[in-house]
Amino acid sequence: MKRTYQPSNRKRLNKHGFRSRMATANGRRVLAARRAKGRAKLTVSDEFVG
């Protein structure tokens, strides 16, 4: 049986990246909350340089 988690960096960035967070009001709320908490990495995009 195939496992449910088949990692792909492209999908990860498209779903959880900075630009997708900025695209919706709720996503911007997530970023604001993470900034307020002092997170070093706001989104998964921060792990990728390019």
Swiss-Prot record:
<comment type="similarity">
    <text>Belongs to the bacterial ribosomal protein bL34 family.</text>
</comment>
<dbReference type="Pfam" id="PF00468">
    <property type="entry name" value="Ribosomal_L34"/>
</dbReference>
<keyword id="KW-0689">Ribosomal protein</keyword>
<dbReference type="InterPro" id="IPR020939">
    <property type="entry name" value="Ribosomal_bL34_CS"/>
</dbReference>
<dbReference type="GO" id="GO:1990904">
    <property type="term" value="C:ribonucleoprotein complex"/>
</dbReference>
<dbReference type="GO" id="GO:0005840">
    <property type="term" value="C:ribosome"/>
</dbReference>
<dbReference type="GO" id="GO:0006412">
    <property type="term" value="P:translation"/>
</dbReference>
<protein>
    <recommendedName>
        <fullName>Large ribosomal subunit protein bL34</fullName>
    </recommendedName>
</protein>
<dbReference type="InterPro" id="IPR000271">
    <property type="entry name" value="Ribosomal_bL34"/>
</dbReference>
<dbReference type="GO" id="GO:0003735">
    <property type="term" value="F:structural constituent of ribosome"/>
</dbReference>
<keyword id="KW-0687">Ribonucleoprotein</keyword>
